[in-house]
């Protein structure tokens, strides 16, 4: 007898499904809108914890406005974090830690803002930076910001699969596609050349991850300036989404752990029989609210109880704890994070930091390496506009050495 049961069709969650890219772009629009609002809050004397709280409120508010009435999971893919000048990692203090709750932004420091939203598990994260209380930036801070922008644009171009944007005859396209992608060692060397042009250093273990549905740290990763025993794995390919990170320092680029509470966590795939009721209750709330996306203890219902509840969860490996880290020389650090989609047409920036206004960010240094300059002139994607638009884009690329946010 034939099986008459109807089977639920398998959902295509890849970028081949237009709905997937739409969800990524919806999450990206939310991330950008909240980033702009949070950036405006980063003024001299502002308490970091209050900025983070407001950012998360805005994320929740914007997320509720989309995909109304549909059974689609949606939420925060990364809590609002604001990292002071020498901090390397995202920083999100707690209200219940009295001393850290009083931490304020200082005039002239580079504050790194990171946050993100997710729709149906498709998360976008963005990190950008502001110089607190300064409209014009000169000197070493300008060197750092300029270097980070161009290093980031260079990395994005090195992630375009070989031959993807090649023109000419079919034979020429095949030849371009047969070229090998740059190795992670070669990528690191090229990025370091940009950093050195501005007398900066790459922050060790700066890591870009492949994103997947409900996962922001998949199998593939690119690690710049890797430390001892650390290496990246995998080559970017069509159909993938990546979170591309760039971090530079005015110091050595070496990193040290900071004597601060670890407040940023993420659910792992490990299972463990938690013994304490408080631990089980905390984990249950985490899974319900955040799935496997990062969260701050500040976002849980009872912050003080959460500080106790996560201890066994971390010890049992069901939660990953992100240790606060800073520059070993206490030097200013910059950091950017761009979420990209790699399609048959090239790289699309889903979320991206703003291009610095170089009429206000004034470095007296510049890139002179011809190889670097040629790579920076490459497009990130195939042009789909008119001939006039193509010519305008070409002129702009030559003028700025890199493309603007797409």
Give names to the regions the model predicted:
Residues 1-406:
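Active-site neighborhoods and metal-handling regions in enzymes and metal-associated proteins
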